[in-house]
Amino acid sequence: MVAPATVRGIDQAPTSHPKLLAWVREIAELTTPDRVVWADGSDEEWRRLTDELVEAGTLIRLNPEKKPNSFYARTDPTDVARVEERTYICSVDEADAGPTNNWMAPAEMKRTMTELYRGCMRGRTMYVIPFCMGPVEAEQPMFGVEITDSPYVVASMRIMTRMGAKILEAMGDDADFVHALHSIGAPLAPGQQDVSWPCNETKYISHFPETREIWSYGSGYGGNSLLGKKCYSLRIASVMGRDEGWLAEHMLILKITSPEGRVYHIAGAFPSACGKTNLAMLEPTIPGWKVETIGDDIAWMRFGPDGRLYAVNPEYGLFGVAPGTDWKTNANAMRTLDRGNSIFTNVALTDDGDIWWEGMGEPPAHLVDWKGNDWTPESDDLSSHANSRFCTPITQCPILAEDYYDPNGVPIDAILFGGRRRDTIPLVTEARDWVHGVYLGATLSSETTAAASGAVGVVRRDPMAMLPFIGYNAGDYFRHWIEMGKGTDGDESKLPRVYYVNWFRKDAEGSFLWPGFGENSRVLKWIVERIEGRADAVETPIGMVPAADALDVEGLDMTSEDIRIALKVDVNEWRDELPLVTEWFEKFGDKLPGVLWAELDALRARLDAEAQ
């Protein structure tokens, strides 16, 4: 074994934090890199890293006139998405992982992965990345340190997190931090030629909730390697929230201002590729309304001193699905990307050094596709992978709300749950109360997408859009949501109202009934007017839906019949849904809160009464 003192840079740490120094030394001794570098987050470091990555063939520098200071990466074709089947929650007690997670005993997983890590950084540089999720000025800053052998990860973490020397300084000598260890698992023998996207066919993304550790091996893809994102901000943070009385959620946060100048904040949980980023950056189509962005993917929510639920976005960047993002669907995202300073992965490359993906208008006559092959409009395959990504600073978003920077967050007035369903689910439904809202979230369902590897188009339950991200037993997670509703000392008026939306309902011919995108502002308007007590709703067995004339559809190319079908609660479709929900709830055994069974029974009774 190589003694740690022989690793270049190991004794040049810019910190005296004893726990951090001991951990870095331990990992260097285990993984035997050629040298250790502490990431400082500087512009000079970004230039050096991106130059090295271009020279290695991992990145291609884009046309600076089109995308200044931006780069393009192609991954190995086997390393393109989160790998849920290789993602583990290694709680001490298997019951704490629950039926929705893969589990392995922590000691066994650490034995297995320690052997994988042994010598895995040979021939490479080990980078130490101090980072903070959320504002470092927060009352309780949420620090992490990622160790990685991937310079692509270092460059991406600079976009996605607050990181570097200023974070290390803020940590001082004794701050707690989440230990996040990552390796691509591709050691280099002396003289061995590297590949442009090194990775390993053996992959593990393991979380140790009790010790707040993340160990990732074998994948360079963002969701598996940018450990501040899903791994820390959702899986580990959800456990922290359970223990400390707050929520870590897969939610956008937006600020909406009415024509009268009244301000509201809405959080929204949607499974991947269901329009979350598009909604977060909405351009309202109705006069006088204004939307600003606070976050597009993750919300941490805590009660404030006034008893209301406040949300912060812990991220510093946007890691969005590229296909389907265009000037029609999300002009603000396109404006953000045009400002540069971004990394694009697995999209297509134009002949003039720009990027392209499906949805961006007429395809060029020639592209180089995400696999590096020539592509023309006659090609059989898509030019860009369905889960291709852009990674860009959120501070470049032209409609970023100033409140984004507030370490105390913003008070949430409404929570949306939404999935992709072609039938059954109306355009918008208001929950009767908090517990009913938890029921709606717990039974959220969507047709699967390409954001995770596996079958596409299958309806699966995705509770609170958190199925792949709950770091503990989902039954306990539902209970935690219910308990959070008691945090206002009995004053439920301080809790956010809960809504279930579905932009994707289709008519008998298979066409979308609702135009979506900017027109979704019309649904937000109805929600705001409900909060203000000004909009009418009709009580149905599943909750409150807009009255026929309550939704502002002026100027829309929709018939009254289209609107009726979009809002319809079909009793037979809902009765068909009941056994599916029953089967879902049974997965959780005695961990499922009894009040959710009671909600299901009450729904069944209301449907039966309606059918008579």
Swiss-Prot record:
It is found in: Cytoplasm. One of its GO terms (biological process) is response to lipid. Its main location: cytoplasm. Pathway: Carbohydrate biosynthesis; gluconeogenesis. One of its GO terms (molecular function) is phosphoenolpyruvate carboxykinase (GTP) activity. The active site is at 274. The keyword rRNA processing does not apply. Its EC number is 4.1.1.32. It catalyses: oxaloacetate + GTP = phosphoenolpyruvate + GDP + CO2. Belongs to the phosphoenolpyruvate carboxykinase [GTP] family. Catalyzes the conversion of oxaloacetate (OAA) to phosphoenolpyruvate (PEP), the rate-limiting step in the metabolic pathway that produces glucose from lactate and other precursors derived from the citric acid cycle. This is Phosphoenolpyruvate carboxykinase [GTP]. The gene is pckG.
